[in-house]
């Protein structure tokens, strides 16, 4: 029996909408990363973008477990300005309470996707919004009930 390898013309992409309200960040990010890669499909092909389009709403209400949400000594995100001594840091709690809370989910998912051109293409299929509104109603997304799959998914 030959190994099946999908062709780009055979790939069908679905649109999913996930409500992240009171959902644990790491569990959500790992599931979304698998869906963006297409690993939940039987026609998964590693070298093609066979994943689905994911819309995440209420990203500002995602939950962090343990001490990660603590603004003083919680999970720290680093960035570098490019100048000597220019390393900057901020905590996950500050980002979630700040102007762009959707960046926490985007960073978590991005770090679970392969770091190459295919990963960048797959990340372009992720749409994260801080509140409950999204402009993708024309695509008729299917609601993905992530919270009811496992009691540990919700906090």
Swiss-Prot record:
The keyword Ribosomal protein applies. Keywords: Ribonucleoprotein, Ribosomal protein. GO terms for biological process: negative regulation of translation; translation. Part of the 50S ribosomal subunit. Belongs to the universal ribosomal protein uL13 family. InterPro entries: Ribosomal_uL13, Ribosomal_uL13_bac-type, Ribosomal_uL13_CS, Ribosomal_uL13_sf. This protein is one of the early assembly proteins of the 50S ribosomal subunit, although it is not seen to bind rRNA by itself. It is important during the early stages of 50S assembly. The keyword Disulfide bond does not apply. This is Large ribosomal subunit protein uL13. NCBIfam families: rplM_bact (TIGR01066). GO terms for cellular component: cytosolic large ribosomal subunit. Pfam families: Ribosomal_L13 (PF00572). One of its GO terms (molecular function) is mRNA binding. The lineage of its organism: Bacteria, Pseudomonadati, Pseudomonadota, Alphaproteobacteria, Rickettsiales. HAMAP family: Ribosomal_uL13.
């Amino acid at each position: 029996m030959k190994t099946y390898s999908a062709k780009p013309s055979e790939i069908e992409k679905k649109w999913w909408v996930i409500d992240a309200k009171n959902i644990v960040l790491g569990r959500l990010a790992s599931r979304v990363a698998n869906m963006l890669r297409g690993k939940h499909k039987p026609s998964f092909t590693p070298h093609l973008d066979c994943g689905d389009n994911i819309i995440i709403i209420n990203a500002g209400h995602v939950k962090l477990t343990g001490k990660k949400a603590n603004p003083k000594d919680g999970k720290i995100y680093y960035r570098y300005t490019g100048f000597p001594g220019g390393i900057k840091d901020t905590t996950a709690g500050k980002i979630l309470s700040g102007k762009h809370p959707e960046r926490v989910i985007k960073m978590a998912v991005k770090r679970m996707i392969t770091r190459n051109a295919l990963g960048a293409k797959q990340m372009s299929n992720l749409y994260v919004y801080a509140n409950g509104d999204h402009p993708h109603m024309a695509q008729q997304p299917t609601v993905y009930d992530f919270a009811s799959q496992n009691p540990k998914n919700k906090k």
